[in-house]
Amino acid sequence: MQKLLREFNYQDIEGIVLDLRNNGGGYLHEADSLTRLFINYGPTVQVKNPSKEVEILHSWRSTKVWEKPLIVLVNKYSASASEIFAGAMQDYNRGIIIGQTTFGKGSVQRFKSTNNGQIKFTDSLYYRITGLPTQLAGVKPNLVIPSLLNDEILGEGEYENAIKPSNIDDAYFVSFTNFDSELLQNSFQERISASDYFNKINEIKKQRESNLLLSLNIDERKLIKESDQNNTLELVNFGRTLSGKKEFVNFSEYEDYVIEDEFIMDAEIDQSLKVLVELIELES
């Protein structure tokens, strides 16, 4: 990542969108290292162990590589280390978080070796530098994008045995003050409201909310399945149109499509890029 950002600087790239959607996370210290590429110095995350001692991951030596505008795109499946990074960027006011509230996994796991293998267990919770927990709460975006993902059945909070966090003291840090995401809110909402794609999202959500009962009539089930397939096809083709690619003629063609190693634009990235352009103009 550091090498890539240096290349972007060399190419005079004016801003980036970091897509962390569906990113389930990774190592705590990798999230810490990634955060340091975007800030001067200071704390990145706090870890509270079973003895209630708090360790602050902190460095006074700057390893910052990227100083230009940053957008972080997240969704309900962004979890753990992804949330550490997104939360730090938000707390430092270093980047704008766009998407949906993240998963809410703020626990730290470790492995203990045994004679027959390893045991994975949870022994700590990590907290944002503000002292607020990510556990259960997740990271709430600055700009919310409508989604078909159901917040009520997704996330750490839906587990019966999920650990209940408490707040801790904040760590000393100095936030960036070079922009206010509220300045982008009105134009962002206007674009979302005018978008055929997101209007379709809202239409599908309303359909689902009004059809909470599942019919046992086979003909009705076939109609529901056909409607779901048509909705999916319409949303998929929207992304292909944005990418300048040929639309799928029918759902069967979409099902038979072999995913290639290529970038496909989608509506959320499209909106994020529009926000990035505005942010660049505000900071220029």
List each model region and its residues.
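Short flexible/disordered coil segments
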Residues: 76-88, 111-114, 133-137, 158-170
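Conserved functional hotspot residues or short segments at active or partner-binding sites
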Residues: 134-284
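Short, functionally important structural connectors and interaction interfaces within domains
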Residues: 19, 36, 118-119, 135, ...
